[in-house]
């Protein structure tokens, strides 16, 4: 009942289009070195011992390694940072103060709080599907 459906197929031309895995892994040490250098500079700028940069790189690799990660920049990054700051400063009764401090509308503050609550909720409550 079992038949080899592709027994006569010997066309290996598709293999010529595959990337060389050895070439792919060569860029990762350079990326990690660049990340380490960036962290050393930022830690020094903040007055923290730059020797901790490698520990941070290792922690990032252990947490995010093996997966695809989107790192925002530009307006998306600015909005996310603003929302995080609003969330950190929010105490449940200071929405009006936050609108003034960050120069945004009430609606923007409420959206930021809702967004951060959703992210925190997902962090602690994984999807069941």
UniProtKB/Swiss-Prot annotation:
Residues 28-64 are annotated as: Dimerization. Pfam families: Mor (PF08765). Residues 77-129 are annotated as: DNA-binding. It is found in: Host cytoplasm. InterPro entries: c-mor_Regulatory_Protein, Homeodomain-like_sf, Mor_transcription_activator. Changing residue 70 to G/I/R/S/V: Complete loss of DNA-binding and transcription activation ability. The keyword Transcription regulation applies. Signal peptide: none annotated. Keywords: Activator, DNA-binding, Early protein, Host cytoplasm, Transcription, Transcription regulation. Changing residue 68 to G/F/I/L/K/P/R: Complete loss of DNA-binding and transcription activation ability. Changing residue 74 to R: Complete loss of DNA-binding and transcription activation ability. Its main location: host cell. The dimerization domain in the N-terminus and the DNA-binding domain in the C-terminus are connected by a linker containing a beta-strand. Activator of the Pm promoter, which controls middle genes expression. Activation of Pm allows expression of protein C necessary for late gene expression. In addition to Mor binding, activation of Pm might require the interaction of Mor with the C-terminus of host RNAP subunits RpoA and RpoH. Homodimer. This is Middle operon regulator. The gene is mor.
């Amino acid at each position: 009942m079992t038949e080899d459906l592709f027994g006569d197929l010997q066309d290996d031309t598709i293999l010529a289009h595959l990337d060389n895995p050895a070439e792919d892994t060569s860029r990762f040490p350079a990326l990690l070195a660049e990340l380490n250098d960036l962290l050393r500079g930022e830690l020094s700028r903040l007055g923290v011992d730059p020797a901790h940069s490698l520990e941070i790189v290792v922690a990032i690799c252990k947490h995010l390694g093996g997966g695809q990660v989107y790192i925002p920049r530009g307006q998306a990054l600015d909005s996310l940072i603003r929302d995080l700051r609003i969330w950190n400063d929010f105490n449940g009764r200071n929405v009006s103060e936050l609108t003034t401090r960050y120069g945004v509308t009430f609606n923007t503050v409420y959206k930021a709080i809702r967004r951060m609550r959703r992210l925190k909720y997902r962090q602690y409550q994984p999807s069941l599907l």
